[in-house]
C-alpha cells in the first residue's frame, strides 16, 4: 500500500485591526504552519494623529489637554512628562506639596493602568469575570480624579509647569485613604481568584518567555523588563518628584513569562497603595504651584482668575518661553519608560518634541517571541505586553 505524502502550504492569517482582543487597532499578519506560528508582522499606524508635530505649534499650556490621548488608559503620566520636560529645561523648581500631589495622582494612575490591563488580559486567556470587577475599582479612582480635577478618565488637564492646576479640595485626602482601605483586600481577592487557578496557570506559565539579556537588548522597560529579572525602575533610578522620601520596593520576577509579568503588575498595585498612604501622611502645607513660574506664564489679571474658571487654561497666558537647549526627560509609567526629548529655541513653542512611548518599544519584541508558539497563545502573549495603540501610533 502506498502512502500519500501530504504537504501543507503555510497559511497567512490577518488578525485585526478590528478584533476586540487586539487592544486597539493593531493588525498582525501571522504565518501559520498548522497550529504553529512561523512568522508574525505587526502593522501599526492606524491611530497616528501627528502628536509630535502638533506639539511644535502649541504652547505647553495649550498642549497639556492633548496628551491624555497618547495612552488614553493612563493620561496623568502623559501630563506629568509634558510639564516635566520644560521644567527641567528651564530649571523650574516644583514646591514640595505639588510634588506629593503629583506622586499621589501618578500612583492612582498606575493602579488604574494595571487594572485596565488585568481585565482584558484575563478575557484574552478565557476568564471573563475579572473584567467586570476591575471597572468597579477603576470607577472609584475616576471619582477621586473628578473631585480633584473636574474630569474623569482623560483630559484631566491637572498638571502645570511648576506645580498643579489647583490644590486638592477639602476632604479629598480622607476619600483617597478610604479608597486605599477598600482596594487592598480587593487585590487579595484577585490573587485568590486568579493566581493559583490551574487553567490560568497552564495558559500563561512558560508562554512568551523573554530572557534577561533579550529584555535589555530589545530596549524593553516597565513590567516587561522587571518580569525578566531586571530590577530597574526609573522612580528609584532617576529620583524624580519625592519618591526618594517614601519607603517602597521595586517588584520583579525572574521567569520572564506571561505569568511573571502578571505577578509584577499585581504586586506593583500593592506598592502603589503603600506609596499613596505614605504621601497622604507626609504631605506638607505650602503652595501647590511655583508662583515664579506662574508669573512667567500669566497674562494680565482679569475675571478669568475667578473661582468658576479655575480649571480653564485661559487662566495662564502662554507667555512662558522655552529656553534654547535640548533635554531628555523620562518617568516610569504603568507600561514602562515614557520619555520626552525636547528642543527649545527661546520661543513659546518647542522646536522639537519627540515622544518615546514605552509600549511602542515593548511591542517590537512581539514577532521574536511569537515564533514557534501555538496560535492560541498569541492573544495571551500580546495581552501580557500591555499596549495601547494611541500611545504606540501617537
From Swiss-Prot:
Keywords: Membrane, NAD, NADP, Plastoquinone, Quinone, Thylakoid, Translocase, Transport. It comes from Synechocystis sp. (strain ATCC 27184 / PCC 6803 / Kazusa). NDH-1 can be composed of about 15 different subunits; different subcomplexes with different compositions have been identified which probably have different functions. The keyword Thylakoid applies. GO terms for cellular component: plasma membrane-derived thylakoid membrane. NDH-1 shuttles electrons from an unknown electron donor, via FMN and iron-sulfur (Fe-S) centers, to quinones in the respiratory and/or the photosynthetic chain. The immediate electron acceptor for the enzyme in this species is believed to be plastoquinone. Couples the redox reaction to proton translocation, and thus conserves the redox energy in a proton gradient. Cyanobacterial NDH-1 also plays a role in inorganic carbon-concentration. It is a peripheral membrane protein. This is NAD(P)H-quinone oxidoreductase subunit H. It comes from the Bacteria. Its EC number is 7.1.1.-. Belongs to the complex I 49 kDa subunit family. It is found in: Cellular thylakoid membrane. PANTHER family: NADH DEHYDROGENASE [UBIQUINONE] IRON-SULFUR PROTEIN 2, MITOCHONDRIAL, NADH-UBIQUINONE OXIDOREDUCTASE 49 KDA SUBUNIT. The initiator methionine has been seen to be kept and removed. One of its GO terms (biological process) is photosynthesis, light reaction. It catalyses: a plastoquinone + NADH + (n+1) H(+)(in) = a plastoquinol + NAD(+) + n H(+)(out); a plastoquinone + NADPH + (n+1) H(+)(in) = a plastoquinol + NADP(+) + n H(+)(out).
